[in-house]
């Protein structure tokens, strides 16, 4: 199944239900993300951008409203349905990165790629070189800087087919040069797949030419 659209309909984190929240183009509204388009979701700290990404990925369900994939509610999706979406339709780079600190950078990447068989060794090596961390590929992830870890996690997120890629503050610890390189790589992969990009930011955003900027 190809995933052409993701819609958040009347969605609101339950923790916000009893609170007065600022005007939002997503919370308590209807927002649709379409395959092939790129979106920047800007938010203030604590505005719920990480929650939004986790809801779309099915990692959390503590929200009011509806999450729709191709117009179909995800409310009753079982684990098998979610696993299928995560393996073939939605790639995800979480803000907390979720790397195994005792494994090397390359081992973290290969752990995922071993499950998908998606990216060739040469492609992975090319990404490592372009992002300036090839010389650190055999270092334990826990000994790398946060910016280096962010680049490792980005490469790992690309080791699968996808219709959408969710990027939660993907360049918060990168300088402008590495930000641009990361953006180029993401754009190349998304374009090759005809995929959509949903990137969040509280300030330092991924340097893409976005089709739409939305305020959370």
Q: Each PLM stretch: what is its role?
A:
Residues 165-169:
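Catalytic Walker B motif of ABC-type/P-loop ATPase nucleotide-binding domains
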Residues 140-148:
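Conserved ABC ATPase signature
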Residues 65-75:
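Conserved ABC transporter NBD signature motif
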Residues 96, 102-115:
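Q-loop/switch helix immediately C-terminal to the Walker
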Residues 74-91:
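ABC ATPase NBD coupling module
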Residues 57-58:
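Helix-to-loop junction immediately C-terminal to a conserved catalytic motif
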Residues 121-136:
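Conserved ABC ATPase "signature" region
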């Amino acid at each position: 199944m190809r995933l052409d659209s993701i819609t958040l309909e009347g969605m609101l984190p339950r923790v916000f239900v009893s609170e007065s929240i600022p005007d939002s183009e997503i919370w308590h509204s209807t927002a649709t993300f379409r395959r092939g388009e790129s979106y920047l979701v800007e938010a203030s700290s604590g505005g719920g951008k990480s929650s939004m990404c986790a809801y779309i990925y099915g990692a959390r369900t503590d929200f009011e409203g509806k999450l729709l994939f191709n117009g179909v509610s995800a409310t009753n999706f079982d684990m098998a349905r979610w696993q299928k979406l995560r393996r073939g339709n939605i790639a995800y780079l979480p803000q907390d990165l979720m790397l195994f600190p005792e494994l090397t950078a390359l081992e973290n990447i290969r752990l995922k790629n071993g499950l998908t068989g998606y990216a060739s060794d040469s492609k992975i090596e090319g990404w490592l070189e372009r992002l300036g961390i090839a010389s650190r590929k055999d270092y334990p992830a826990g000994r790398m800087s946060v910016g280096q870890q962010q680049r490792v996690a980005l490469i790992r997120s690309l080791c699968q087919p996808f219709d959408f890629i969710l990027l939660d503050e993907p360049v918060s610890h990168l300088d402008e040069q590495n930000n641009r390189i990361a953006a180029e790589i993401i754009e190349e992969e998304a374009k090759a797949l005809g995929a959509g990009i949903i990137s969040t930011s509280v300030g330092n955003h991924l340097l893409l030419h976005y089709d739409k900027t939305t305020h959370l």
